[in-house]
Curated annotation (Swiss-Prot):
It comes from the Eukaryota. It catalyses: DNA(n) + a 2'-deoxyribonucleoside 5'-triphosphate = DNA(n+1) + diphosphate. Zn(2+) 2 binds at residues 1316, 1321, 1335, 1340. The gene is pol1. Residues 118-634 are annotated as: Interaction with mcl1. The keyword Lipid biosynthesis does not apply. GO terms for molecular function: chromatin binding; DNA replication origin binding; DNA-directed DNA polymerase activity; nucleotide binding; single-stranded DNA binding; zinc ion binding. Zn(2+) 1 binds at residues 1256, 1259, 1283, 1285. Residues 63-110, 141-241 are annotated as: Disordered. Catalytic subunit of the DNA polymerase alpha complex (also known as the alpha DNA polymerase-primase complex) which plays an essential role in the initiation of DNA synthesis. During the S phase of the cell cycle, the DNA polymerase alpha complex (composed of a catalytic subunit pol1, an accessory subunit spb70/pol12 and two primase subunits, the catalytic subunit spp1/pri1 and the regulatory subunit spp2/pri2) is recruited to DNA at the replicative forks. A zinc finger (CysA-type) spans 1256-1285. The lineage of its organism: Eukaryota, Fungi, Dikarya, Ascomycota, Taphrinomycotina. One of its GO terms (biological process) is lagging strand elongation. It is found in: Nucleus. This is DNA polymerase alpha catalytic subunit.
Length: 1405
């Protein structure tokens, strides 16, 4: 940029000064003010807006800018700062003055032009003006360079010149943004203090952006380079730029913008000669991170070049003529919705005929009316046409007055006849209602509103979306036909390519036409995301440091292709995890096969990510733990005040929605993302499709893809691995590979297909189905069915709890989090199991879909069952079943329709001529139909459902118990033994060993049962060769498949629970295999004992990997809310994770490992995350004794319990545990008769006492651990009691230590801690159940007892007295010592009531 008067030569100025001096004048006296030229045109507001519109109509002035942000919005950038010379002068000035800087506030789009000319100048952020002396600065720079690479040569001093002005304004703005980031004292905010002046051996271009297919020309001549020495700037990345991704099979060498020679020849940085030496090789990454594992996977991913369409402007609109039909209508496939100011906003896709692509579309539907139904009060006079008319007139007048008071100016009404069949007792089955409709822009009426002329009003809180789909009969995502679309009604309201307005829902109808456009679901654009965050310890907030995305375009969800067969392209965004990137990282990033964008700050990273989202315009997000990551992302967008933050969804927003509490915060987050579906592998819906323990990404990938994903310690990675260029790149690639894993799992389990089919059946929202709301699906399918048949449907109950659950967890978790609920009615029948080992064939006879079949069998429906108060005297009264002549109810007809549709589809699956795509579609459809039909009963018994009907649920379960009991009686009549039965199945002991013979018996039994019913049907579910039946819902058996091959089938045992580690499950499985092997009992017991001894030896020698010791527990509530959380290991681990800033929420499965020993405290204090244990630098040692006694022994003991020949003490001995601790337990359990205590020896009496310790005051070592009376006597009877260090214990010290230990035991007794005798429960509490000894845990059937009872305390005190009361054989000093101890301890024993027996109290009666 030229300076003013740059054309005047210095010689001319000197001549002018000499002339003035000779004349005796000065320049100030001769200065004349010149009239400046007009810099701006004075125009009116209307003229300025016209100019802006003309600019918008013009083409972009930058062609193919790779999405770098050169988009003209038509307005002048009055409020944006640009680089100028003054910026550098301000930075370099030595003045210590601090300037006040104003914030860079973006102008509102609709501001008047005068608002753009405010005097608030936008200036750079304030900087610290203090300078250090040269010596300190040299030391500081040496430290910085040394931290980057130890082999960089010593810096030579160079003359500092002015900064080059060839950098673009965009780059300067980026530099300012980077310099404004809060930094620590390691790197100063002054750029000159941290930019190295030494030239690296490998020069880096000005941009670390991956090179586009047509790279700009390299600098070749000296005119292109500033002659002044310049400081090295860190390479910048233009926001929003893209680059082609290299195909795996075609490796293309990436060329830098300037070669090494060109830099040496044209860009000399100083007149002084600088010796350049190659940098030392990067430090290899820790061996803990197996780079080859995911590098091999990354090389096999089918990456493609970024298509040219991705470089086009993401906001380009589509012409209306390209999306409409000849008659002016439009086909629109809707996917998601949101509600805004009384209008329904639908998001979906339309077909662009010009590009022959499906593009995103936004449809704003106005004119949807709220429908209210006023029920007139019953008249006491005789019913006549005149009285009915008068009554209706009264209701009309009262409603008109009511609406007028509430500001409703426009409304319509009519009298309509509707039916009602639900739980309000005073609502007649059929009645005339005053139907009132008015716009949703007016406020809603209260739900409990009544009047003098009407008793009820229905529909006051009906949601806008519900009103639309019910009135237009829209059943989930489908093609809609829009008549009279208005393309001018909506402008820039969304981020979609097409925006349409529709004035009335009457212009929208479901399209049943099958043409080229509407014959299938449009292809989707899927973006799979993975995030990495770190904790800002100063602010205690999570910050985003890395985002990786993988884009799959034109995904046909109906074909069900695996991720490997679909082309994709990926990009990653990363910012420095510390102050700067490791030296050489940006060069590695440019050479990486997929695009890596190195951003300078979190702000630029988030801006670039949103720019990518707008460019690719994804329809669906894939993620793992995405709901939590999405919440963090939104918080960072809001915290950093990112412009266009709403583009994470598809609705443009200028203000953040307000949230008042946690539940509404979740609601707000879902509203922001509206328009783009969220598929989360770890939410309720994802978990319902994947059987796993912890639902971690590694476990899911191993189970579904059979690929071992390497878990990494995030904390360690951020601290050490990312210090080197290669380490940071490997860390990034690990995140990048996760995007493929997430997408591959989601595509394999058919997440999109199944959720769409479920939504089409229920008629609700696709996005809501993806959150796992099963209860809402049941509600919507009933709403559609009853509304279609002319019924008034129940209103949705409005309460704080219901609103909190609107976007919360699924039913089971809600119940758990809200507290223990008492049984609402009697459930299914469960027979008492005939425990034991069965060597003959066992048949499992199962009723197919018992409850749906009962609903059809007995015609149970809201419309058929009489639930009036006169017919039900109490809550437990069973309603009568409808008569056989009653018309089929809506509920059974709906279920019959679902069952019949599934039967037809299963018939299609048998067609061998069907294509794989057809078979996949049919299979998904039959799964969706089965899930829907089987879950319909749940809405009747779910108290928070709109269709909750307790009498119907009671009747259905009663008929289920009746059917099971009748089945048992029939088996008894046929001479078959029913060994167990549960709700919808019975187990029959056939007393034969041949499978075919057992099947013949089962078929005969099946025929006799099925002939009793028309809809109920029983069938043979399983044939077990051998079976070990433990308890209710707990058994193991060898299941015979169709070829007669046995497979182990386990239900309810400990090896199926996540609370037991892998080693416990392996040991239990071995024991089960032995028991079910058919060998002799003696051989089985001998093999188990040998295995356990070998198992214990291997564990104590560290032969098992640490990951087999991981225990899982699920959080039922927030970790802070557990009253006994201090004694629960998983709660303590969860609290530690929260303290580190990690995300922990209700429902998470917490993994942990117990380390240390009993001497280190309670197991809860010794619980650590697996990463802490498996860290190569960790000094923690796994507590093998804890695992053997609490994880291995209890499940094995329960497995072997029905087998004779061993006991708990013997099993403990095989595991290397102290068998003496288990003898008393075995005796108390096995025998009702016990010996008198007076007949027991000292060893038998004091087998369970704790040892008494003597700790040396001199060396702090435990000198004596006295475990028996014999050892006590040997120590105390001696002449002196000495420590190994030579310290001699005084009698006073011994008495004090013994007394202190006994007081600890007394305190332990008075704590009154109760423990459950069921080792699988492990409950430990001070709370006592109202049922006495019953365990407080809901799912436990064990009994509680005192952890430390009065007998144990008595024996502990008696243990010491036994040794000191008699002094036979003691030395003189020993006698004195024992007498002193006896005197003090006897005082304690005299206070123990167990010592004395009150004979008078015994014989007083």
């Amino acid at each position: 940029m030229r300076k003013r008067n740059a054309g005047i030569k210095p010689s001319q100025r000197f001549a002018e000064l000499r002339a003035l001096r000779q004349a005796g004048k000065t320049r100030a006296s001769t200065y004349e003010s010149k009239e400046n030229e007009e810099l701006y045109d004075n125009v009116s507001e209307e003229e300025y807006r016209k100019i802006v519109r003309q600019r918008l109509d013009e083409d972009d002035f930058v062609v193919d800018d790779n999405g770098a942000g050169y988009v003209d919005n038509g307005y002048d950038e009055w409020d944006q700062s640009h680089y100028s010379d003054e910026d550098d002068e301000n930075e370099k000035g030595s003045s210590g003055r601090k300037r006040k800087k104003s914030k860079n506030v973006l102008a509102e789009p609709n501001q008047q032009i005068g608002a753009f000319f405010k005097a608030n100048a936008i200036q750079p952020a304030s900087r610290i003006a203090n300078r250090k002396n040269n010596e300190k600065e040299d030391e500081f720079m040496a430290e910085i360079l040394g931290s980057i690479d130890q082999d960089i040569p010593e810096r030579l001093s160079t003359k500092k010149g002015n900064r080059s002005h060839t950098t673009s304004n965009a780059k300067r703005r980026s530099q300012k943004a980077a310099s404004s980031i809060s930094t620590t004292n390691v790197v100063s905010s002054d750029p000159k203090k941290y930019i190295p002046e030494t030239v690296p051996s490998t020069p880096q271009p000005a941009s670390s952006l991956p090179i586009p297919s047509s790279p700009p020309a390299a600098l070749e001549t000296e005119e292109n380079v500033d002659s002044q020495p310049m400081e090295l700037d860190e390479p910048e990345l233009p926001v929003g730029s893209d680059a082609p991704i290299i195909d795996v099979e075609e490796s293309i060498a990436m060329k830098p913008l300037m070669s090494h020679d060109q830099v040496d020849d044209t860009a000399s940085l100083s007149k002084a000669t600088i010796s350049q030496q190659p940098l030392s090789p990067m430090t290899p990454l820790s061996s803990e991170l197996d780079v080859s594992a995911f590098s091999e996977i990354n090389s096999k991913i089918k990456n493609v070049d970024v298509p040219a369409s991705s470089y086009s402007s993401p906001i380009s609109k589509v012409s209306p003529s390209d999306v409409t039909e000849e008659d002016g209508s439009l086909f629109f496939f809707w996917m998601d919705y949101t509600e805004m100011y009384g209008s329904l906003c639908l998001f979906g896709k339309v077909y662009d005929k010009a590009t022959k692509q499906y593009v995103s579309c936004f449809l704003k539907v106005d004119g949807i009316m709220r429908s209210l139904y006023f029920l007139p009060r019953p008249s006491s006079s005789s019913v006549s046409e005149d009285s009915i008319a008068a009554q209706t007139k009264d209701v009309y007048d009262e409603v008109a007055n009511l609406l007028s008071k509430r500001g409703v100016k426009e409304w319509k009404s009519r009298v309509s006849k509707y039916k009602y069949a639900f739980e309000l007792e005073d609502v007649p089955r059929t009645a005339d209602y005053l139907e009132v409709i008015y716009s949703y822009s007016y406020p809603a009426l209260p739900t409990d509103l009544t009047g003098s002329s009407f008793s009820h009003v229905f529909g006051t809180n009906t949601a806008l979306f519900e009103q639309f789909v019910l009135s237009r009969r829209v059943m989930g995502p489908c093609w809609l036909k829009i008549q009279q679309p208005n393309f001018d009604a909506v402008k820039n309201a969304s981020w979609c390519r097409v925006e349409i307005g529709c004035s009335s829902p009457q212009n929208i109808s479901v399209s049943f036409e099958k043409n080229e456009i509407t014959s299938k679901t449009p292809p989707m654009t899927v973006m799979s995301l993975a995030f990495r965050t770190l904790i800002n310890k100063e602010q205690n907030k999570q910050e985003v440091v890395m985002i990786s995305a993988r884009i799959f375009e034109n995904v046909d969800i109906e074909k069900g292709l695996p991720a490997n067969d679909m082309p994709s392209y990926s990009f990653s965004l990363i910012r420095p995890l510390k102050q700067i990137f490791p030296n050489g990282f940006e060069k590695l990033a440019r050479q990486h096969k997929s695009s890596i964008f190195c951003e300078r700050s979190e702000v630029s990273l988030l801006n670039n990510f949103l720019n990518k989202v707008r460019t690719y315009d994804p329809d669906v997000y894939f993620g793992h733990d995405f709901e939590m990551c999405y919440s963090v992302l939104l918080s960072r967008l809001k915290e950093r005040k990112i412009h266009n933050w709403s583009s994470i969804g598809r609705l443009r927003r200028s203000e953040w929605p307000r949230s008042f509490n946690r539940s509404s915060q979740q609601f707000v987050e879902k509203q922001i993302i509206a328009g783009r579906l969220m598929c989360d592998l770890s939410n309720d819906f994802g978990r319902s499709m994947i059987k796993a323990q912890s639902w971690s990404l590694s476990e899911i990938v191993l189970k579904e893809l059979d690929i071992k994903r390497q878990d990494i310690n995030q904390e360690k990675a951020l601290q050490s691995w990312t210090d080197t260029a290669h380490g940071l790149l490997d860390y990034l690639v690990h995140c990048e590979i996760d995007t493929f894993f997430i997408a591959a799992v989601a595509f394999k389990i058919q997440m999109l297909q199944l959720s769409k089919n479920l939504t089409n059946i229920a008629g609700n929202s696709w996005a809501r189905t993806l959150t796992g709301t099963r209860a809402e699906r049941n509600e919507y399918i009933l709403l559609h069915e009853f509304k279609k048949n002319g019924y008034i449907v129940p209103d949705k109950q409005q309460s704080i709890r219901r609103h909190a659950e609107a976007f919360g967890a699924e039913d089971g978790l809600q119940e758990e989090s809200l507290g223990k609920k008492k049984d609402k009615y009697k459930g299914g029948l469960v027979f008492e199991p005939q425990k034991g080992l069965y060597e003959t064939c066992i048949l499992v006879m199962d009723f197919n879909s018992l409850y749906p079949s009962i609903i059809q069998e007995y015609n149970i429906c809201f419309t058929t069952v009489d639930r009036s108060p006169s017919n039900s005297d109490s809550d437990d009264q069973i309603p009568d079943t409808p008569s056989a002549s009653a018309n089929q109810g809506i509920f059974p007809r709906l279920i019959a329709n679902l069952v019949e549709r599934r039967r037809q589809i299963k018939g299609l699956l048998k067609d061998n001529s069907a294509t794989p795509t057809q078979r996949l579609q049919w299979d998904i459809q039959q799964q969706a139909l089965k899930l829907t039909a089987n879950s319909m009963y749940g809405c009747l018994g779910y108290t928070k459902s709109r269709f909750y009907a307790r009498p119907l649920a009671v009747l259905i379960t009663y008929k289920g118990r009746e059917a099971l009991m009748n089945t048992k009686e029939l088996a008894d009549q046929m001479g078959l033994q029913v060994i167990y039965g549960d709700t919808d199945s019975v187990m029959l002991n056939t007393n034969v060993t041949d499978k075919n013979h057992a099947l013949r018996i089962g078929n005969e039994f099946k025929e006799k049962v099925n002939e009793r019913y028309s809809k109920l049907e029983i069938d043979i579910d399983n044939v077990y060769q051998r079976m070990l039946l433990h308890a209710k819902k707990k058994y193991a058996a060898l299941q015979l498949d169709s070829q007669g091959k046995p497979n182990l089938d386990v239900k309810g045992l400990d090896m199926k629970r996540r609370e037991f580690c892998t080693l416990a499950k392996e040991a239990s499985k071995f024991c089960l295999d032995q028991i079910l092997s058919g060998e002799l009992t003696e051989t089985v017991i001998e093999n188990i004992h040998s295995y356990l001894m070998d198992f214990s030896e291997k564990m104590r020698n560290g032969k098992f990997p640490a990951n087999k010791f991981i225990i899982f527990n699920r959080l039922g509530k927030n970790p802070e809310d557990y009253p006994n959380g201090k004694t629960m290991p998983f709660v303590q681990v969860a609290l530690k994770k929260k303290a580190r800033g990690e995300n922990v929420r209700v429902g998470d499965v917490i993994p942990f490992i117990i380390a240390g020993s009993d001497a280190d405290g309670h197991p809860a204090d010794r619980a650590y995350s697996p990463q802490e244990i498996m860290n190569t630098n960790s000094t923690l040692v796994i507590d093998y004794n804890y695992y053997l006694s609490h994880q291995i022994l209890p499940p094995i003991e329960r497995v072997i319990a029905p087998i004779e020949g061993t006991n708990r003490a013997r099993l403990a001995e095989c595991l290397g545990l102290d068998a003496r601790k288990y003898y008393s337990h075995e005796t108390s359990e096995s025998s009702a008769f016990q010996r008198y205590e007076s007949t027991l020896t000292d060893d038998q009496c004091f087998i369970n006492v704790s040892p008494l310790l003597l700790k040396c005051p001199s060396c702090n070592a435990t000198s004596f651990s006295l475990r028996s009376v014999k050892s006590l006597k040997e120590t105390l009877y001696a002449n002196t009691v000495e420590c190994d260090c030579g310290y001699e214990y005084s009698d006073f010290t011994i008495i004090l230590q013994f007394s202190s230990q006994l007081r600890d035991f007394i305190n332990l007794y008075y704590e009154g801690i109760l423990v459950c005798d069921d080792s699988s429960c492990g409950n430990r509490t001070r709370q006592m159940s109202v049922y006495g000894k019953r365990c407080c845990n809901k799912s436990c059937r064990g009994s509680v007892h005192f952890e430390y009872n009065d007998e144990q305390l008595y024996n502990q005190i008696k243990f010491l007295l036994k040794a000191v009361q008699t002094t036979t054989g003691a030395t003189r000093n020993g006698i004195i010592r024992c007498n002193a101890i006896n005197k003090n301890i006897s005082r304690i024993m005299n206070k123990n009531a167990r010592e004395f027996v009150d004979m008078g109290l015994i014989f007083s009666s």
